[in-house]
């Protein structure tokens, strides 16, 4: 074969290699798009490097390949493909055919260079070769066609860079699998952890809201009472369980935790009337007060009667009560009941000592029971009626006067007379000291058959007692009014009290301060009372401490 033929064969082989490398490069670009997740390890050469190295290796082999002597029998020199085939390890010759040795090898008479071993590639990426048929006619094939012998057909094989690159890519991707799996595990862990945090946060929020909701009243609009008994020696947890069963708290355990957190440790045993409108804080405060030994009827409202109130004022106060009572508690019903003679007769029979001197029907008293209803605070229950309420007030007066009944009798006074004097003392003086002195003045005037001359009685007769009266109005009262309560004209006491006196006024009227005073006048602007034992001094006190304030 001529030099030109060899060069052409080399160029043809080189072009084939380049075409194959171009195909590998195109396939590599497709793989890069499809397998973007898989990263080529840092130490694996890229496709471009493989192409460049392979091309340089082929050129070096072509350049350094020695000239093989022509076979004596064929005269066809070995082709470069033969050299590459001999260089590739692990490719066995055809065992089924015995290839005869050349005459030169048998005789050894012809001198010439020994067998030339091609230089091993300096860089191998895969040691497993792939044999494929080439697209051109090799020198061996030409010799086979020219020679008389029919050698065993052989398929010329070369390393296919594309398969090599593909296997290299697959083999290079294998180490990345653990990284991918590890990355997946980390990602799963992070997601699980975030989900856990989200659930924890949501659980904490809803748990906090549940606790707050458990501390609120069961029914904020409920007015009903629930009677609960707390046994002696019950701890906070047991009390919480009892309240939960009674429907007063939503969760007994939360109640006990809250009680400990707020340091409510002094909860007392007993019977309690509690409401569903109470919060946990309200319930704990109520349990600190202590219950009763026996169950009591729930209190729906409280009624406070101030000291010195008249029956008209008491009736108006009762009419302001609101609640789900057994019967309607109105001012009209109250006034009708205190004037009911049947009811009065029953009361006299029930409280004989208190009511034995009660003003008679034709005494001129506006209300026979005026002054007999003790001023205090009363509990209004579901079963409370007008009659039961008045009876409770009479019972309170009887109870407070019981210690003084014998003393009143020893002073030659009736209960009605004492209460009448006390009703005037209640309004004329504000301090206990003054009340005792004023009571002494009244007794001195009574003992001398002098009219009491109290403006309080005149105001009651006019229906103005209890109203805001100015100093000018007080001075200008009608002392000539035709009324049994006109103590300017009438000597002695009125038919009965004009208001409900306080216990202090009652005691001051029983234990009056003795003196020779017959007059008194109060400076309402200063709250000071001036006393005198003669008319001249009294007139001077009036001019100085009352009339001077009118200008």
Swiss-Prot record:
GO cellular component: plasma membrane
Additional observations: Peptidoglycan cleavage activity could not be detected in vitro under a variety of assay conditions, but a gene deletion can be complemented with E.coli mltG, leading to the conclusion that this gene is the functional homolog of the E.coli endolytic transglycosylase.
Pfam families the record matches: YceG
UniProt source species: Streptococcus pneumoniae serotype 2 (strain D39 / NCTC 7466)
Family assignment from sequence similarity: Belongs to the transglycosylase MltG family.
Compositional bias ranges of the Low complexity kind: 100-110, 145-157
HAMAP family to which the protein is assigned, alphabetical: MltG
Function field: Functions as a peptidoglycan terminase that cleaves nascent peptidoglycan strands endolytically to terminate their elongation. Involved in peripheral peptidoglycan (PG) synthesis.
Positions in the Extracellular compartment: 209-551
Protein name: Endolytic murein transglycosylase
Keyword terms of this UniProt record: Cell membrane, Cell wall biogenesis/degradation, Lyase, Membrane, Transmembrane, Transmembrane helix
Region of interest called Disordered, as start-end residue ranges on this chain: 38-180
């Amino acid at each position: 074969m001529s030099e030109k033929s060899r060069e052409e064969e080399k160029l043809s082989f080189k072009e084939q290699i380049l075409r194959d490398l171009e195909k590998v490069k195109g396939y590599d670009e497709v793989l890069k798009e499809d397998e973007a997740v898989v990263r080529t390890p840092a130490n694996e050469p890229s496709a471009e490097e493989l192409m460049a190295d392979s091309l340089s290796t082929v050129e070096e082999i072509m350049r350094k390949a020695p000239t093989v002597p022509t076979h004596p029998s064929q005269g066809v020199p070995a082709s470069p493909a033969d050299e590459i085939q001999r260089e590739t390890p692990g490719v066995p010759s055809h065992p089924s055919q015995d290839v005869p040795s050349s005459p030169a090898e048998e005789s050894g008479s012809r001198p010439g260079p020994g067998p030339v071993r091609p230089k091993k590639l300096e860089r191998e990426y895969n040691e497993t070769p792939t044999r494929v048929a080439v697209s051109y006619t090799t020198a061996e094939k030409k010799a086979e066609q020219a020679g008389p012998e029919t050698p065993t057909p052989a398929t010329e094989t070369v390393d296919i860079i594309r398969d090599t690159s593909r296997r290299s890519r697959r083999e290079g991707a294998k180490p990345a699998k653990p990284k991918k799996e590890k990355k997946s595990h980390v990602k799963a862990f992070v997601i699980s952890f975030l989900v856990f945090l989200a659930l924890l946060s949501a659980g904490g929020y809803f748990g906090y809201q549940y606790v707050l909701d458990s501390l609120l009243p069961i029914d904020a609009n409920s007015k009903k009472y629930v009677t609960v008994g707390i046994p002696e020696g019950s701890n906070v947890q047991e009390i919480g369980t009892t309240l939960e069963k009674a429907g007063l708290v939503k969760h007994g355990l939360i109640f006990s935790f809250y009680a400990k957190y707020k340091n409510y440790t002094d909860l007392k045993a007993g019977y309690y009337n509690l409401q569903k409108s109470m919060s946990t804080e309200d319930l704990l405060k109520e349990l600190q007060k202590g219950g009763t030994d026996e169950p009591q009827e729930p209190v729906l409202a409280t009624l406070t009667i101030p000291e010195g109130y008249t029956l008209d004022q008491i009736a108006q106060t009762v009419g302001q009560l609101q609640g789900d009572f057994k019967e309607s508690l109105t001012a009209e019903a109250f006034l009708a009941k205190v004037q009911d003679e049947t009811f009065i007769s029953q009361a006299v029979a029930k409280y004989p000592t208190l009511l034995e001197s009660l003003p008679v029907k034709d005494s001129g008293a506006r209300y026979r029971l005026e002054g007999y209803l003790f001023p205090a605070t009363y509990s209004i229950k579901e079963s409370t009626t007008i009659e039961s309420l008045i009876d409770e007030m009479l019972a309170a007066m009887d109870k407070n006067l019981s210690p003084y009944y014998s003393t009143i009798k020893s002073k030659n006074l009736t209960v009605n007379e004492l209460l009448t004097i006390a009703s005037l003392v209640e309004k004329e003086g504000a301090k206990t000291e003054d009340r005792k002195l004023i009571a002494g003045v009244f007794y001195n005037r009574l003992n001398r058959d002098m009219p009491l001359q109290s403006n309080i009685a005149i105001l009651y007769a006019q229906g103005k007692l209890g109203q805001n009266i100015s100093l000018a109005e007080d001075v200008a009262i009608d002392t000539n009014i035709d009324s049994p309560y006109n103590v300017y004209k009438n000597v002695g006491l009125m038919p009965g009290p004009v208001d409900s006196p306080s216990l202090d006024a009652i005691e001051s009227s029983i234990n009056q301060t003795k003196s020779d005073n017959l007059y008194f006048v109060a400076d309402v602007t200063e709250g000071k009372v001036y006393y005198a034992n003669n008319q001249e001094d009294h007139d001077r006190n009036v001019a100085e401490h009352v009339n001077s304030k009118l200008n």
